[in-house]
Amino acid sequence: MSVDPAHRRQQGRQAPPPPFDAELAGPLDKILADLPMPLTPALVPDRRRRSLAGRLTDEQIRRGGTFETEERTVPGPPGAPPVTLTICRPTAATGPVPVVYHTHGGGMVAGSHRSTELAGELDRAQELDLAVVSVDYRLAPEHPDPAPVEDCYAGLCWLAEHAADEGFDPRRIVLSGNSAGGALAAGLALLTRDRSGPRPAGQLLQFPMLDDRCDTFSAGQMEQVGLWDGLSNRAGWQALLGDRRATPDVSPYAAPARAADVAGLAPAFIEAGSVEALRDDALAYAARIWEAGGEAELHVWSGAFHSFDEWVPDAVVSRAAHHARVAWLRRILDR
């Protein structure tokens, strides 16, 4: 007998959340004291100001000469403005290098191609001698679906077409995103499959927003708990989709959990914290990929909140998450 999804969310509301990791609990309290939750439309300007203030500079990206960086403006989707890419090349590269195509987070409403999470991509790139290309897509609610994912697709197509000229290996492009960026990376994997576009080598989905219906047990359990709680998640989806949210009229390229077919996708790395609203969406998406005969590696970090490693990078669990991502990337790119 099936369980009504709304009932599962209600059950979650009545359940206590899992405990936070001891190294994360104190920092989270300080974060939430400064960063009001849940997200509301009135808070979007504040989130954008914070993101702008935290943008990485060229000097921070170069890391003392480890990378060279440039901004590139490339054609956008048909009839839409051009798309800006930040290109980060390892200066010591001697041949075509693999490249991570980064779609930033920000709940669909904030963030940029130079947001602080780009530092995590550069950490992994520095360890593995990779390039990173980060795309600046249009933001909701001013630019609702499909603008964000189409911008990202336009950037991906340019990257694949010009990879050899840029010193990149077009056969080893990995899609990577955090939170809203995880939704876009997963949506891109579906979109490029269905359009017979560039074929990525993998998709690295960190704490991804996958389902606009927000009807899981964890969505209720963490409705007002932690960073990017269930109420914030609904607000982000509402900004992207408007009145279409939680209706049948939602594209899988916007909300990948809506995909009827997840076969034939690039290998996936999917992760979530045990104390975040998006946890059960990550579990369900990995399970569907396995059921379709696909390849997915799933991690649920015990006691962790949304994007914990960006905020508390020196915690033991944060270092474990970093090592897991690096190990997965190494395996995928060595094939």
Task: Specify the residue positions occupied by each region the protein language model found.
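A glycine/proline-hinged amphipathic helix-loop "lid/cap" segment
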Residues: 1-87, 334-335
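Short beta-strand/loop motif that positions the catalytic acidic residue
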Residues: 270-272
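Short amphipathic alpha-helix adjacent to the substrate-entry channel of hydrolases
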Residues: 114-133
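Short beta-strand element of the alpha/beta-hydrolase
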Residues: 96-106
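Gly/Ser-rich "nucleophile elbow"/oxyanion-hole loop immediately N-terminal to the catalytic nucleophile
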Residues: 161-175, 195
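Hydrolase active-site cap/lid region
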Residues: 190-248
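Alpha/beta-hydrolase active-site loop
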Residues: 143-165, 325
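Catalytic active-site module of serine/aspartate enzymes centered on a nucleophile-bearing elbow/loop
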Residues: 313-335
